[in-house]
Amino acid sequence: MSSAVGKRYARALFEVASERSKIDQVEADLGAIVEAVEGNEDLKKIMLHPHIAADAKATLADELFKSHVGEEAFNFLNVLIENGREVDLVDIYRSFVQLANEARGFADAIVTSAKPLSTEEQNELAEKFGQTLNKKLRMTAVVDPAILGGVIIKIGDRLYDGSLKTKLETFAQKA
């Protein structure tokens, strides 16, 4: 699947959830569906098998999820099954979570450093970049000695490279 298709489905579901003030519920329900499908190999094989009829998948979804998730998530799952997009469920869920987090003012950041950062350093980076982007950042720290020093911060599709390795490479190219 192209991620553009998944994003369109996620955006459509997000708009419905937003209009009904059910973003949190839909996110939790969709997460429960994803967890159930991904956590059970037999269920996953059935739901993702291209030669199993949509009617059979819809009946199975009805038995497993109708009384356990809200109307929006359940109906959305049926739309995916009808359109042959159930294989894209995980990607759609990830896109939905990203949209929900953006609406809440959250962003995920991956901070790569040569040595482990202290909690204080992580909080300071989260605060400074959070203020710049007007977001509350959730930091994930990664240690990569190859960057030599400094930090590389990835937030969404933005990359802030303050690593010593990149600075040395840039300097060497200019020399």
From Swiss-Prot:
Compartment list: Cell membrane
Membrane protein topology class: Peripheral membrane protein
Recorded superkingdom: Bacteria
Family, as annotated: Belongs to the ATPase delta chain family.
A Pfam family it matches: OSCP
Oligomeric and partner information: F-type ATPases have 2 components, F(1) - the catalytic core - and F(0) - the membrane proton channel. F(1) has five subunits: alpha(3), beta(3), gamma(1), delta(1), epsilon(1). F(0) has three main subunits: a(1), b(2) and c(10-14). The alpha and beta chains form an alternating ring which encloses part of the gamma chain. F(1) is attached to F(0) by a central stalk formed by the gamma and epsilon chains, while a peripheral stalk is formed by the delta and b chains.
A GO CC term attached to the entry: proton-transporting ATP synthase complex
Functional description taken from the UniProt entry: F(1)F(0) ATP synthase produces ATP from ADP in the presence of a proton or sodium gradient. F-type ATPases consist of two structural domains, F(1) containing the extramembraneous catalytic core and F(0) containing the membrane proton channel, linked together by a central stalk and a peripheral stalk. During catalysis, ATP synthesis in the catalytic domain of F(1) is coupled via a rotary mechanism of the central stalk subunits to proton translocation.
Keywords per UniProt: ATP synthesis, Cell membrane, CF(1), Hydrogen ion transport, Ion transport, Membrane, Transport
Protein name from the UniProt record: ATP synthase subunit delta
UniProt xrefs under InterPro entries: ATP_synth_OSCP/delta_N_sf, ATPase_OSCP/d_CS, ATPase_OSCP/dsu
Organism: Brevibacillus brevis (strain 47 / JCM 6285 / NBRC 100599)
First-listed, main subcellular location of the protein, grouped into a coarse class: membrane
